[in-house]
Amino acid sequence: MTAPAPRPGIMDIRPYVGGESAIEGVDRILKLSSNEGALGPSPKAMEALRAMAPEMHRYPDGGAEDLRKAIGARFGLDASRIVCGAGSDELLGILCRAYAGPGDEVLYSAHGFLMYAIAAKACGATPVTAPEVDLTANVDNLLAAVTPRTKILFLANPNNPTGTYLPATEVARLRAGLRADILLVIDAAYTEFVSRNDYSGGIELVEAGDNVVVCRTFSKMYALGGLRLGWAYCPENVAGVLNRVRNPFNVGAPALAAGLAAFNDTAYAELCKSHNDYWLPWLSGQLAELGLTVVPSVCNFILVRFPKDAGKDAGAADKFLRSKGIIVRAMGGYGLGDCLRITIGTGEENQLVVAALKEFVGA
């Protein structure tokens, strides 16, 4: 007798491994591996979490009505077309389950978020990548990779792990070049950090047709990664599909309470944005002065390329940083083995990273 077998393709999935948070034998850790908010969550979010603790025996609002209404009011959106999830990851997975399956293809750029391939394989679809140009998604290459089997195109904009982005005009050109039956999912997890006049999170494209979804998260700017909360803005038909497929109580009450408080604390969000606006160029400039190649980023992290010389490569740098208690993200899983991704931390953390890498390169 054989054991129950999963669907074909499931065992081909390489499990996602998040950024490490501990080093054996090291007490003080600088965790700069997961692009978490440098300043932590809003004090008002923490207070909301404490205040709702006595009600944790109650089921949450399955429709996340208060949060959806707040998001809709802020951005001028139809709240009935907003769907909340346990992180935007859950929503990406549900979209794959609902719109792709065996024999279908899910398309994304070569260095797109690893979860896209996992979500595709989990529903039996085939992940397909399109070449990038200068570590940036390329519209022509994406459109050239479309086949009759393409059902979903994921576009991380800005992109993790490269930190690069496509201007709004290019994203609009991408959407215009797609068949109407292909779902374009714009993963805008880092949109709050972007300070570029030619950038858009893509909401206007959702309003313009029936095949664009924008996903957002509370894990980055709002620093609520531990609670798992995200949202999607969709055409009416797609929102209806998501609400049929998602679990009825997919977002917990603690996440909803803290998320609403964080969302309404605009002053704290502005503080976090200002922090990143200062330290992102500072850290990028400091590492460039050490002779390292820093990919221009609009996010709360930078991708740093190291020489391939033995002892000076990314692997050696990672090992050296870990010896100092500094955890960054190795990029081998993205096909960028000569790079490390470093989250923008507190001012002290950023200075310690520079000091450690200065020692490593012998500057």
UniProtKB/Swiss-Prot annotation:
The modification N6-(pyridoxal phosphate)lysine is found at K220. It comes from the Bacteria. Keywords: Amino-acid biosynthesis, Aminotransferase, Histidine biosynthesis, Pyridoxal phosphate, Transferase. It catalyses: L-histidinol phosphate + 2-oxoglutarate = 3-(imidazol-4-yl)-2-oxopropyl phosphate + L-glutamate. GO terms for molecular function: histidinol-phosphate transaminase activity; pyridoxal phosphate binding. Its EC number is 2.6.1.9. Gene3D superfamilies: Aspartate Aminotransferase, domain 1 (3.90.1150.10), Type I PLP-dependent aspartate aminotransferase-like (Major domain) (3.40.640.10). One of its GO terms (biological process) is L-histidine biosynthetic process. Pathway: Amino-acid biosynthesis; L-histidine biosynthesis; L-histidine from 5-phospho-alpha-D-ribose 1-diphosphate: step 7/9. It is an enzyme of class 2 (transferase). Its cofactor is pyridoxal 5'-phosphate. NCBIfam families: hisC (TIGR01141). Homodimer. Belongs to the class-II pyridoxal-phosphate-dependent aminotransferase family. Histidinol-phosphate aminotransferase subfamily. This is Histidinol-phosphate aminotransferase. The lineage of its organism: Bacteria, Pseudomonadati, Pseudomonadota, Alphaproteobacteria, Rhodospirillales.
